[in-house]
From Swiss-Prot:
Subcellular location field: Secreted
UniProt family annotation: Belongs to the serpin family.
Cleaved signal peptide residues: 1-24
A Pfam family that the UniProt record links to this protein: Serpin
Name of the protein described by the UniProt record: Angiotensinogen
SUPFAM superfamilies per UniProt: Serpins
InterPro entries documented for this protein: Angiotensinogen, Serpin_CS, Serpin_dom, Serpin_fam, Serpin_sf, Serpin_sf_1, Serpin_sf_2
Length: 476
């Protein structure tokens, strides 16, 4: 069997094969030409007019240094502003990145989900994953940069400078993708979506980081926090200090996101994502309701209820149903429910793959009364573990050339992605009995047993979150 990293690239290249066939004898156009270096950029890189000075560096301040709290309102406004003057090319570039991150997201979600038990759930961010790997690409030189580009799904080996991925374009497009997700609700919308990303760069004392690299991260993570601390003497204490620091700065209850660090690490790269959505037209039901984890175990959780014209599809052949609920004018929540709870893994394997969005075209509008749990999902995963499972354990290992991050011989430890996903009603608590609105009879859809979810931004086609909900208030 081919290594998983290669199969991902092969799948993307198969999807793009039509581009080469259509081109015939014409001048070669890179399938992701909006994301690679232009000829003029290459001329500047290969023949600089003046000698390039070395990148300025700095030493991160100690972790105990007082830090300002994250202002999520300001982060929201910053993302909205980033989408106000988008040109057609910006949107096309975002769509290209959306295609790439979806492919990688499905691939790595499958890898990650194989480590979960049947009763466990989790939430996964393809955007955070792709952003993290792109950040390392920006900080890498060959051969590491070429290996990362191939893993990101962009062909380029042996094709010259104009086939090399421009990491800054990709990071800018990732900011566009995040902005499109939150901008659709508008400033006055009750059901406004919040999306905040914070990166912590934790280094051994005395290690110098290059300023251009750290500044480049601001595209997808407006707040980047470089901090130094002793990582070697007591790795467990170092992990506790990092968790406490991030909790105090963000106010997000991520749990024990980081459990330990490798004592020989000199750099940890941790990305923290907080999503908060409110379901327009939904209300919180009185009291707690039963959610069945399996056939014999239930937990009591808050439930939401709402009636509207939603898109729906029941696939009797594969024993699953899909309900699509708008979170904003351009963002959808997709809820995938197995007809039989024991089939959840089978439905998950069938649904979360590269033809997912094509299959979603089978949905059609109808009146639905939807009841589902309020969600507070937490998950943390180490990209180093995922890379090892994808047969690429050395990609960010000791031999990786990350000279654009630091001139020091970096030893990258854990590369953490942590997600806090919250979904609530936008209305007040509903009365015990809610009269059905006039119109066609509403189909009753109740999610009171394990199901899958996805959050899709329509303009870019990017899937921001994929998840399995087995315990609605705890998915660590």
């Amino acid at each position: 069997m081919a290594p998983a990293g290669l199969s991902l690239g092969a799948a993307i290249l198969c999807l793009l094969a039509w581009a080469g066939l259509a081109a015939g004898d014409r001048v070669y156009v890179h399938p992701f030409h909006l994301l690679v270096y232009s000829k003029s950029n290459c001329d500047q890189l290969e023949k600089p007019s003046v000698e390039t000075p070395p990148d300025p560096t700095f030493t991160p301040v100690p972790i105990q240094t007082k830090s300002s709290a994250v202002d999520e309102e300001a982060l929201w406004e910053q993302l909205v502003r980033a989408t106000e003057k988008l040109e057609a090319e910006d949107r096309l570039r975002a769509s290209e990145v959306g295609l790439l991150l979806n492919f990688m997201g499905f691939h790595m979600y499958k890898t990650l989900s194989e480590t979960w038990s049947v009763a466990s759930g989790a939430v996964f961010s393809p955007v955070a994953l792709f952003s993290t790997l792109t950040s390392f690409y920006v900080g890498a030189l060959d051969p590491t940069a070429s290996r990362l580009q191939a893993f990101l799904g962009v062909p380029g080996e042996g094709q010259g400078c104009t086939s090399r991925l421009d990491g800054h374009k990709v990071l800018s497009s990732l900011q566009t993708i995040q902005g499109l997700l939150v901008a659709q609700g508008g400033a006055s919308s009750q059901a406004r979506l919040l999306l905040s990303t914070v990166v912590g760069l934790f280094t051994a004392p005395g290690l110098h980081l290059k300023q251009p690299f750290v500044q480049s991260l601001s595209s997808f993570a407006p707040i980047t926090l470089p901090r130094s601390l002793d990582l070697s003497t007591d790795p467990n204490l170092a992990a506790e200090k990092i968790n406490r620091f991030m909790q105090s700065v963000t106010g997000w209850n991520m749990g024990r996101a980081l459990t330990a660090v490798s004592p020989d690490s000199t750099l940890l790269f941790n990305a923290y994502v907080h999503f908060q959505g409110k379901m327009k037209g939904f209300s919180l039901l009185p009291g707690l309701k039963e959610f069945w984890v399996d056939n014999t175990t239930s937990v009591s959780v808050p439930m939401l209820s709402g009636t509207g014209i939603f898109h729906f599809w029941s696939d009797s052949q594969n024993n699953l149903s899909v309900t699509r609920v708008p979170l904003s004018a351009n963002t959808y929540l997709l809820l995938i429910q197995p007809h039989h709870t024991p089939d959840l893994r089978k439905v998950e394997a069938l649904t979360f793959q590269h033809n997912f969005l094509t299959r979603m075209k089978n949905l059609s509008p109808r009146a639905i009364h939807l009841t589902m749990p309020q969600l507070t999902l937490k998950a943390s995963y180490d990209l180093q573990d995922l890379l090892a499972q994808a047969k690429l354990p050395t990609l960010l290992g000791a031999e990786a050339n990350l000279s654009k991050i630091s001139d020091a011989n970096l030893r990258v430890g854990k590369v953490l992605n942590s997600v806090l996903f919250e979904l609530k009603a936008d209305g007040e608590q509903a009365p015990e009995s809610v009269p059905q609105p006039a119109g066609p009879e509403a189909l009753e859809v109740t999610l009171n047993s394990p199901f899958l979810l996805a959050v899709l931004e329509r303009s870019s086609g990017a899937l921001h979150f994929l998840g399995r909900v087995s315990r609605p208030l705890s998915a660590e």
